[in-house]
C-alpha cells in the first residue's frame, strides 16, 4: 500500500537535481508584483550597509584622535556622531526587515494560491497517480522552505554580499598590503562552498521527498482510522510511519552534518585569515609603519567581511534547500491536465434539453491500457428520459458516468450532449449541466447549509430547506444543535451513512441541473428512507434526463429503459418485464443480485 508512485517521480523521473538558478527562477513571477516592497528593501539595505561601513572609520577617528582631544566639545561631537550612526542603522534595519518579511509573506501566499489552483484543476487521472499526502507536503512543507529563503535568506544573502563588497573596497582603501593577504585566502574559502554545495542540494531534495512520504502514509492511515482499528493495525501502521520518519531523519542528519562541516571549515579559514592579517598588522604597528587606528579600522572591516562570508555560507544551505523545494514544486506546476477546455468552445442551448448520444465509444483507463472499459458503445438517451444501467461489477457502468463528466476522454468515438461533442464544450458549462449523486457522498467539514450549497452557492436558505425536505434530510438536519448552521465534521463524521447519502441527494436536487446522474444513490438507505427518497427522486427527475446505476430492483423498474451491460458492451435493453422474459443476464442479476422489495 505504501509503495504508491510518489508525486516527485511523475513529471521528472531523473534523480539528479536541476540547476539551482533554473529552480529558483520559478520564484520570479511571484516576486515581481512586489516591486514597491523590493525597492524599499533595497533602499533600506543600502542605508544600513553604508552606515555599518562608516562605523570602523568612526572607531579609527576615536582611536587616533579622540583620546588626544583637548576639547571636550570635539570629543562629545565624535561620540554623538557615533550614536547618530547607530540610530540610522537601527531605523534602516527595521525598515529592511519589514519590507523583506512582508514581501516574502505576499510572495509565498501567491505561490500557495497558484499551486493549489493548479492542483485542483488537474484531471482525475492525475489524482489517481498521486498520493494526497505528498501533494499536501508540496503545499505546506516545501513552500515553508521557500518562505525561509524569501523571508530571511535573501535578505541575509544580499546584505552579506553588499557588506562583503563594501568591506573589501574599504580594506583596499585602508591598507592595500593587508588587503592583498586577505585576497590570497579567498580561493581556499570558496572551494569548500563549491564542493559541498551540490551535495547539500541533493540531500535537501531527498530530505523533502522523505518527509512527503511520511506525510502520505499519515494521510492514508488517518483517513482510514476506522479500518485500522477494526483490523487491529495500530501498532503496524505506527511502525510504518516511524520507519518513514526515521528515513527522513537519517537523510536530514546527513544534510545537517554536511552543512555543519561546511560552516565549520569556512569559519576556520576566514578567522584564521583574520588572525594572520592581525598578526601582520601588529608587526607593522610595532615597526611604526602603520597607525593603530588604521589597523583597528582594517580589522573591523575584515571582521565584517568574515561575518559576511560566514553568513553567505550559512544562507547558501537555505538557498540549496529552497532550490530543492522549488524543483519539487516546479515539477508539480509542470504537470498538465489532459482534460482541458477547447480553444474555441461551443455553447449549449438555453434551456439544455439533456439529450445524450454515445457513438461507437471505446475507452480504456490510462492505468489499464490493455483492458477496454467500454467497447463499441452505442447509446441514445432522449431528453427527459430515465435510463438505468445494470450489469455485473466491472461491466463499465461507472465508466459511462465518468466519461459524461469528462473525467476522461474516450480513445474512440464521441459523446454528444444536445448534439454537441463534449470536447467542444467548456468544462464548467458541461459539468454545470449535471448533478451527480455518487455511491459515497463527499461531505465537508463545513455546516449542513454549506454542504448543500456545494453545487449552487447562490441558493437561498429557503431553497436549501426545500431541497432538504425533498431528500428526506430536513428532519435530521433540524435535529442538529444549530440545525443548518451545524458543522458536520471532517467527512461528515457526525452523520450516519444514510444521512450522508440524503445530503448528497439534497445537494443534487438543489443544483437543479438538466441531467441527473445517480450512482447507486440509494445504496446506503434503509427501506423506509429509500421509499421516501424514491418519491423525491421521481419529483427531481421530472423534465430531466436521468442516468441511474442501481442494484435495487425497485429503482430499476421505475426507469423508462434498462440498459444491460457486460464487458464494456450493451448486451440487452428494454423494460423490466421484457428483459425478465428473455431469461438472460438481466434475469440472473435480478434473481441473484438485485434486492427485490416485494413489488
What is each PLM-predicted segment?
Residues 1-55, 67-82, 96-104, 117, ...:
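Membrane-integrated ABC transporters
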Residues 71-73, 77, 170-184, 254, ...:
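Helix-loop-helix
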Residues 119, 241, 329, 358-360:
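Conserved catalytic Walker-motif region of ABC-type ATPase nucleotide-binding domains
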Residues 338-351:
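Pre-NBD coupling/linker segments of ABC/ABC-like ATPases
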Amino acid at each position: 500500500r505504501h509503495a504508491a508512485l510518489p508525486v516527485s517521480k511523475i513529471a521528472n523521473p531523473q534523480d539528479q537535481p536541476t540547476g539551482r538558478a533554473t529552480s529558483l527562477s520559478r520564484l520570479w513571477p511571484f516576486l515581481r508584483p512586489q516591486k514597491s516592497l523590493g525597492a524599499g528593501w533595497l533602499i533600506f539595505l543600502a542605508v544600513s550597509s553604508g552606515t555599518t561601513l562608516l562605523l570602523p572609520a568612526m572607531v579609527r577617528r576615536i582611536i587616533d584622535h579622540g583620546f588626544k582631544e583637548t576639547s571636550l566639545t570635539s570629543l562629545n561631537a565624535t561620540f554623538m556622531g557615533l550614536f547618530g550612526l547607530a540610530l540610522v542603522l537601527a531605523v534602516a534595519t527595521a525598515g529592511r526587515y519589514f519590507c523583506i518579511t512582508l514581501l516574502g509573506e505576499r510572495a509565498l501566499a501567491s505561490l500557495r494560491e497558484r499551486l493549489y489552483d493548479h492542483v485542483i484543476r488537474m484531471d482525475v487521472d492525475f489524482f489517481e497517480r498521486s498520493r494526497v499526502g505528498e501533494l499536501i507536503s508540496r503545499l505546506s512543507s516545501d513552500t515553508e522552505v521557500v518562505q525561509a529563503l524569501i523571508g530571511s535568506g535573501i535578505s541575509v544573502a544580499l546584505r552579506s554580499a553588499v557588506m562583503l563588497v563594501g568591506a573589501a573596497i574599504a580594506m583596499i582603501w585602508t591598507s592595500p598590503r593587508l588587503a592583498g593577504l586577505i585576497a590570497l585566502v579567498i580561493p581556499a574559502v570558496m572551494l569548500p562552498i563549491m564542493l559541498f554545495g551540490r551535495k547539500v542540494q541533493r540531500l535537501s531534495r531527498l530530505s523533502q521527498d522523505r518527509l512527503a512520504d511520511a506525510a502520505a502514509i499519515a494521510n492514508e492511515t488517518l483517513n482510514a482510522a476506522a479500518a485500522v482499528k477494526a483490523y487491529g493495525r495500530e501498532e503496524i501502521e505506527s511502525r510504518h510511519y516511524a520507519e518513514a520518519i526515521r528515513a527522513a531523519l537519517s537523510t536530514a542528519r546527513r544534510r545537517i552534518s554536511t552543512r555543519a562541516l561546511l560552516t565549520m571549515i569556512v569559519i576556520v579559514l576566514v578567522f584564521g585569515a583574520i588572525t594572520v592579517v592581525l598578526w601582520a598588522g601588529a608587526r607593522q604597528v610595532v615597526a611604526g609603519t602603520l597607525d593603530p587606528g588604521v589597523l583597528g579600522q582594517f580589522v573591523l572591516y575584515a571582521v565584517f567581511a568574515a561575518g559576511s562570508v560566514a553568513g553567505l555560507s550559512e544562507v547558501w544551505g537555505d538557498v540549496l534547500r529552497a532550490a530543492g523545494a522549488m524543483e519539487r514544486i516546479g515539477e508539480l506546476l509542470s504537470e498538465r491536465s489532459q482534460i482541458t477546455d477547447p480553444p474555441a468552445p461551443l455553447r449549449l442551448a438555453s434551456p439544455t434539453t439533456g439529450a445524450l448520444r454515445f457513438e461507437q465509444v471505446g475507452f480504456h483507463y490510462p492505468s489499464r491500457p490493455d483492458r477496454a472499459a467500454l467497447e463499441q458503445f452505442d447509446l441514445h438517451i432522449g431528453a427527459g428520459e430515465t435510463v438505468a444501467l445494470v450489469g455485473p461489477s466491472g461491466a463499465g457502468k461507472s465508466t459511462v458516468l465518468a466519461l459524461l463528466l469528462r473525467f476522461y476522454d474516450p480513445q474512440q468515438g464521441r459523446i454528444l450532449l444536445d448534439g454537441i461533442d463534449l470536447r467542444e464544450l467548456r468544462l464548467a458549462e458541461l459539468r454545470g449541466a449535471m448533478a451527480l449523486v455518487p455511491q459515497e457522498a463527499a461531505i465537508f467539514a463545513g455546516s449542513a447549509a454549506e454542504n448543500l450549497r456545494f453545487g449552487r452557492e447562490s441558493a437561498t436558505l429557503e431553497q436549501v430547506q426545500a431541497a432538504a425536505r425533498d431528500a428526506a434530510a430536513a428532519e435530521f438536519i433540524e435535529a442538529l444543535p444549530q440545525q443548518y448552521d451545524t458543522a458536520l465534521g471532517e467527512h461528515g463524521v457526525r452523520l450516519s451513512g444514510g444521512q450522508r447519502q440524503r445530503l448528497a441527494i439534497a445537494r443534487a436536487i438543489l443544483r437543479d441541473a438538466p441531467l441527473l446522474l445517480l450512482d447507486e444513490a440509494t445504496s446506503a438507505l434503509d427501506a423506509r428512507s429509500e421509499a421516501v427518497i424514491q418519491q423525491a427522486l421521481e419529483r427531481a427527475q421530472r423534465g430531466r434526463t436521468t442516468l441511474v446505476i442501481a442494484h435495487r430492483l425497485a429503482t430499476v423498474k421505475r426507469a423508462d429503459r434498462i440498459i444491460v451491460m457486460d464487458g464494456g458492451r450493451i448486451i440487452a435493453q428494454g423494460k423490466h418485464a421484457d428483459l425478465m422474459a428473455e431469461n438472460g443476464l438481466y434475469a440472473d442479476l435480478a434473481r441473484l443480485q438485485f434486492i427485490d422489495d416485494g413489488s
